[in-house]
Amino acid sequence: MEETLKSLSMDYLNLLINGQAFSDVTFSVEGRLVHAHRCILAARSLFFRKFFCGAAADQAAAPPGALLLDHLSPRSPSGGASASSPRGAGGSAAAAAAATPGAVIPVSSVSYEVFLLLLQFLYSGQVSLVPQKGEPRPGCGERGCWHTHCAAAVDLALDTLAAARSFGVEELALLTQKQLAGMVEKASIEDVMKVLMASRKQDLHQLWTTCSHLVAKSGLPPEVLAKHLPIDVVAKIDELRLKSMSRRSPFLSHHHHHPHAAAAGIEASSAAELDDHHKIRRMRRALDSSDVELVKLMVMGEGLNLDDALALHYAVENCSREVVKALLELGAADVNHPAGPAGKTPLHVAAEMVCPDMVAVLLDHHADPNVRTVDGVTPLDILRTLTSDFLFKGAVPGLAHIEPNKLRLCLELVQSAAMVMSREDAQTAAVNAAPIYGESPGGGGGGGVYNASGTSSSMVNLSLDNRMVYLNLGMDAQFGKMNDGGDGDDGGSRGPSSLFSPHGFP
């Protein structure tokens, strides 16, 4: 029986694939013609049944998806539009288009790809919402991406969900919701918030619950969430966090018979969290005004943790090179600290910004060019992808302000640092494999003894010195100036960038 149903499904799908074979209705989507069959669409969709039967002539009785059909003004097969009718007469024009043989029905507000997915489901009862593996997508800049949970896959699923609900195809809507629920578990926090807002708009309670809990677990402070979400949604996220803290509170588990003590514990936790938010806000204001001394006092006197506060990430993206350099020289921040669900380091952020100043100062302070995000992406991978996009596409979407020379310089700096680190690792391995004692390198037969680990240390220090010399020479060649003071550099060479990039950094 199952094989018979599969065969039937494929037979109907072949009707759609074969285009004009036995077709009796034609749609125009984004300037491309889609041939279909009235009987199948009417049998599978209440919307199309009403539409083809002329019920859409009455705007009040028209199904919700009728608005997607461009008020259904009929066109000739050649694509020419008929004389425009008043807005209120759009439904009558729709009925005329549906009843006129050879008329082309224009479809608006739905992309060609989404409309085909909708028809594919109506014909066969099954559909794949994952874009083709490795296919370049507007919302995904990663080469060879499998598009299982990237921004492009999430956008396609959201568009399909909206179309399914508008056209009244509830089975497809449920299927898409399940797929989105799986996607958001691995998606970037920006995409999770995007799905959260879509589920709120369409009253999808289960998807809303999944996404709201993921956002609550992300650790993003309320002031950050407020930049992306409405205030009432931020308030609900805070409520979820308080409930989560109350469940984890030791007062509740060990002193459940003391409700006042439990309440006091929750209140203390909330107060501590609020205090941390205030510290982070003050730290950012200090960095914005280049007051690194105040940040130092907060570290020493208030116990501010620069890594937990993402101080270096914030400074790289919003402050000048001097501020980043001074912050690194405090010695209280880990230059390779991963942040956010994606696990990006400050060097990842600088690479995405294509800012040679920031890349150089981070590498000068021993940022690791080989460190990987959760998805296995290194800063070098980011720059190579951007360079490839420039070579093959001529521009990078969303980064039109980037200059090719700066991109090339960033790539050279990070490549050089990666090569130096590779040589250092090879030298260290070779020295460790050598005998611990042997003749003095100077010869002379005097029975001199040298320590291999000491030699290794000097080799590594020499390599690091060479690396810094290269970086400074590279910056001198590009900008004509680059010294420890960095006079006149206010970080203005960077293009505008958001602290919360499309790549998943919170």
UniProtKB/Swiss-Prot annotation:
The keyword Calcium does not apply. Pfam families: Ank_2 (PF12796), BTB (PF00651), DUF3420 (PF11900). Keywords: ANK repeat, Cytoplasm, Metal-binding, Nucleus, Plant defense, Repeat, Ubl conjugation pathway, Zinc, Zinc-finger. PANTHER family: BTB/POZ DOMAIN AND ANKYRIN REPEAT-CONTAINING PROTEIN NH5.2, REGULATORY PROTEIN NPR5. Belongs to the plant 'ANKYRIN-BTB/POZ' family. 'NOOT-BOP-COCH-like' (NBCL) subfamily. The BTB/POZ domain mediates the interaction with some component of ubiquitin ligase complexes. This is BTB/POZ domain and ankyrin repeat-containing protein NPR5. It comes from Oryza sativa subsp. japonica (Rice).
